[in-house]
């Protein structure tokens, strides 16, 4: 497979994973924080096994100088997941996903301050178009302001987009850190961050998991992460 075809295939897989996570989460009868914890733990474990299978050494020294940013990225990732999964409980998967797609807009707006990139007229036009689309997705032009539950879902999805934009920005700074190791640390940190939050907010004794839910959790941790 030539590099161009491989790149296109990778992009298709990434977009498919990115756009279908909400459908899977809908059918997992667990709190969003539990799903986020399992997703991080399973994802980190899968990458570790992948490195072992490929007989690739874990590059600790490459991570050491960037450890603080990696930890921060993992923390942001955990809040990104929680807010997105919570959004699915208040609005439709389609609406939450479209709001989540505002993340590149936030990255573009922050780029002049973080990366000294020029905010061109073309970029501003794209941002304006995205914002107009966001207004139409919210349903305001057709039915006025959304109901409280729907509005909460939209706001949670937008908060998730902000967190995701922060994660994208940090990963741009960490672009020279090996991909597998970087992602593994970020996922592990996100999972660890979720533990105290779950202990404080979730009655774990009342949790139940169906076989279908367990399968979807594993798929979410491996494919969607």
Language-model segment annotations:
Residues 97-100, 116-136, 147-154, 207, ...:
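Loop-to-transmembrane alpha-helix entry segments
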Residues 47, 51, 71, 119-141, ...:
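Hydrophobic transmembrane alpha-helices of multi-pass small-molecule transport proteins
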Residues 23, 44-63, 132-148, 189-213:
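Membrane-interface helix-cap regions at the ends of transmembrane helices
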Residues 1-45, 75, 83, 146-173, ...:
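Glycine-/small-residue-enriched transmembrane alpha-helix faces in small-molecule transporters
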Residues 34-37, 41-45, 85-118, 160:
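Specific alpha-helical transmembrane segments that line the substrate/conduction pathway
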Residues 8, 65-71, 119-131, 153-154, ...:
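Cytoplasmic-side transmembrane-helix entry/capping segments in multi-pass membrane proteins
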Residues 55-95, 100, 136, 221-225:
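Specific transmembrane alpha-helical segments of multi-pass solute transporters/efflux pumps
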Residues 19, 41, 48, 74, ...:
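Hydrophobic/small/kink-forming positions within alpha-helical transmembrane segments
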